[in-house]
């Protein structure tokens, strides 16, 4: 069965490598696109740096206690 999964990709300073982990799963792609839309609206209100690459990819740039945190959220089709 086909479904869609939202993955979060970031650089882990603890593991010293790029980590790609499943973040959310849905059967319908439109539900995940809506989730990214809602996230984009929230980031805009909170004045967080972000870039919506396309309807399936959102990039977020944040700084926390002097540490730069970059997250990329991507929707991918998976078989379950």
Predicted regions and their residues:
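Helix-centric, low-specificity signal for extended rod-like, repetitive segments
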Residues: 1, 22, 35-37, 45
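Generic "edge-of-domain/loop-turn" microfeature
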Residues: 11-15, 32, 80
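Short aromatic-glycine-(Arg/Gly/Cys) micro-motifs in beta-strand/loop hairpins
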Residues: 1-21
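Extended low-polarity, hydrophobic cluster-rich segments
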Residues: 4, 25-26, 69-71
């Amino acid at each position: 069965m086909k479904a869609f999964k939202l993955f979060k990709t970031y650089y882990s300073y603890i593991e010293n490598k790029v980590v790609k982990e499943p973040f959310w799963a849905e059967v319908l792609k439109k539900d995940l696109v809506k989730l990214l839309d809602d996230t984009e609206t929230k980031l805009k209100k909170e004045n967080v740096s972000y870039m919506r690459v396309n309807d399936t990819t959102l990039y977020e740039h944040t700084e926390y206690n002097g540490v730069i945190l970059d997250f990329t959220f991507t929707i991918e089709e998976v078989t379950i």
